Amino acid sequence: MPTINNVFSSDGLLAGAIKGFVPREAQTEMAKAVKRAIDTTGSLIVEAGTGTGKTFAYLAPALLSDGKAIVSTGTKNLQEQLFHRDLPLVKKALGSKRKTALLKGRSNYLCLHRVAQHSGNSTLVEKEVLGQLSEVKRWSSTTKTGDMGELKTLPEDARVLPLVTSTVDNCLGRDCPDYEDCYLVKARRKALDADIIVVNHHLFFADMALKDTGFGELIPEADAIIFDEAHQIPDIASDYFGESLSTRQIH
């Protein structure tokens, strides 16, 4: 197995695979520290300046490790970028055979049952919603993942989205007639089988809050968890675990 020096040196694996790659001492040192933390199941906080190349510095050690790792990003856009661009790049450079998976929250996946429910529903009289529903139905016949993010023409706040996605409250689970074809179920199965799972902070802490209730969790257990943009964690975590008191309650 390659060492960190084999990966990040001037004649290393990244330099050989990525045009214009320039070794940076801070990047190599960070990668070594991340590798050490993973190998010893330790904790590590890294503050890296702009241009350090921190993404490669944590992806390479994760790919070189034997256990399952979760990588969490600050936003869904960064999650997409990491999974579709950075991770394949480093994986190819290392010649890694590790399995990877992208996992998003439930509302990001098409619900086949709800699409069927609302198809032909005469109560959907507004042209905008009907047009969006037709667009979703056309896309549903070709998508492999059911990830609503694939539908670039659909606005993020499209009014049809609550009609074609599910929530914890309205999901039928194993009682759903489309359970075996459910895109959310498929995404979780892929995550269970993967070595590297890419999530985002909101999903991570929402899932942790669900774990506290004893059901409904999506993210599998892992040997290592890596948070990118970790400075966002206090605000996001407090949304799910914080308590607030008013002055009236205190008195």
Predicted features and spans:
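The conserved Walker
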Residues: 50
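Walker A/P-loop NTP-binding motif
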Residues: 35-36, 55-68, 85-89
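A substrate-engagement module of RecA-like helicase motors
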Residues: 2-17, 67-197, 202
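Residues immediately C-terminal
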Residues: 78, 204, 232-235
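Short basic/glycine-enriched coil/helix segment immediately N-terminal to the Walker B
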Residues: 185-195, 211-223
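Conserved phosphoryl-transfer catalytic core
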Residues: 230-231, 235-251
